[in-house]
C-alpha cells in the first residue's frame, strides 16, 4: 500500500527499508537528529534568557513535518518516540543548566524539566490540532512567555 501511494514498486521500497516499521524508525531518527543538531548549536545562555530563539527554530521543523509529528505525538502516538525526544532535550538542558548554574539539588531541575517539556509537547499538540493558526514565531514567543512567566501570562489576558 505504501509503495502504491509513493508510486514506487515494492522492490524499490524493500531496497531501502526492511519493512514499514523500519521506514517509521528511520523517519523518527531523522526528526530526532534534526532536533538534536538544532539544540546543539544554541548556547546555554539561550535556555535562560531567550528560549524563543530555540522555539523559533523548533516550530518550523514541526510545521514542515506536521503530518508525521501529529501521528507521533498525537492521541495514539508513539510513546517510545516521545520518550526519546524528552531524553534528547533533557540531556541538552541539564548539560547547559549545570554549566550555567550548578544545582545542589537535582530534584528541582527534574521537576521543572518534567513540567516544561510536557507543556511544550502539549503546546505542539495544541498547535497542530488547532490548525497551526499562530505563526511559528508567535508560538515561540508564547512558549517563551509561559516558560519565563508561568501563570502570570493569563493575568495579563484577564479583563
Mark where each language-model region is.
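A short secondary-structure junction motif
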Residues: 27, 34-38, 65, 69, ...
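Amphipathic alpha-helical segments that line or abut small-molecule/effector binding pockets
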Residues: 48-63, 67, 114, 118, ...
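Solvent-exposed, amphipathic alpha-helical segments
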Residues: 34-42, 119-130
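Alpha-helical structural segments
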Residues: 5, 22-42, 53, 57-60, ...
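Helix-turn-helix
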Residues: 1-22
